[in-house]
């Protein structure tokens, strides 16, 4: 008689055979967003009403820039993984491939734009592209 754990019985099930890894990735990013969202709200609340020079100086400090960057990166990776599952469930064929490509490109473009903007604010005139 063999003893099979519930995890072993569930492993490999599903059409993609990677549901466990995806579930853990989504869970970890959701927990990270649970911590980062209130911190990001505090950062944004403190930035409201600042002049442009004060805002550049504020995001030039490490804590606000780091919290903002982490929030955008973790949030967009969570978005990419979530939209991938939604697209896999509701689209077929070429439309599925196009939608996945669009959502991944969009997510990484938002991450790149946010990190570039934070680097420009934090480093000032040093970063020129």
From Swiss-Prot:
Q: Which CDD domains match?
A: SQR_TypeC_SdhD_like
| Cofactor binding mode and count | The heme is bound between the two transmembrane subunits.
Q: Which residues cross the membrane?
A: 23-43, 66-87, 98-122
Cofactor(s) demanded: heme
The molecular function GO annotations come to: heme binding; metal ion binding
Question: What membrane topology does the UniProt entry give?
Answer: Multi-pass membrane protein
Task: Note one Pfam family from the annotation.
Answer: Sdh_cyt
**Subcellular location as annotated:** Cell inner membrane
Q: List the keywords (alphabetical).
A: Cell inner membrane, Cell membrane, Electron transport, Heme, Iron, Membrane, Metal-binding, Transmembrane, Transmembrane helix, Transport, Tricarboxylic acid cycle
Top-level taxonomic group: Bacteria
Q: Cytoplasmic side of the membrane: what ranges?
A: 1-22, 88-97
Q: Name one GO cellular component term.
A: plasma membrane
Indicate which residues the UniProt annotation says bind a ubiquinone: 90
| All ranges on the Periplasmic side of the membrane | 44-65
Q: Where does heme bind?
A: 78
Q: Which GO terms describe its biological process?
A: tricarboxylic acid cycle
How is this protein organized at the quaternary level?
A: Part of an enzyme complex containing four subunits: a flavoprotein, an iron-sulfur protein, plus two membrane-anchoring proteins, SdhC and SdhD.
Biological role: Membrane-anchoring subunit of succinate dehydrogenase (SDH).
Q: What is this protein called?
A: Succinate dehydrogenase hydrophobic membrane anchor subunit
């Amino acid at each position: 008689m063999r003893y099979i754990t519930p995890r072993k019985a569930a492993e490999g099930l599903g059409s993609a055979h990677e549901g466990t890894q995806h579930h853990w990735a989504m869970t970890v990013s959701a927990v990270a967003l649970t911590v980062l969202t209130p911190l990001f709200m505090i950062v944004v609340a403190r930035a409201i009403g600042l002049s442009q020079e004060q805002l550049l100086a504020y995001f030039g400090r490490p804590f606000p820039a780091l919290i903002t960057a982490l929030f955008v990166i973790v949030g967009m990776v969570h978005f990419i993984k979530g939209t991938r599952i939604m697209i896999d469930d509701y689209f077929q064929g070429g439309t599925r491939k196009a939608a996945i490509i669009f959502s991944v490109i969009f997510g990484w473009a938002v991450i790149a734009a946010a990190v570039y903007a934070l680097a420009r604010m934090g480093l000032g005139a040093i970063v020129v592209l």
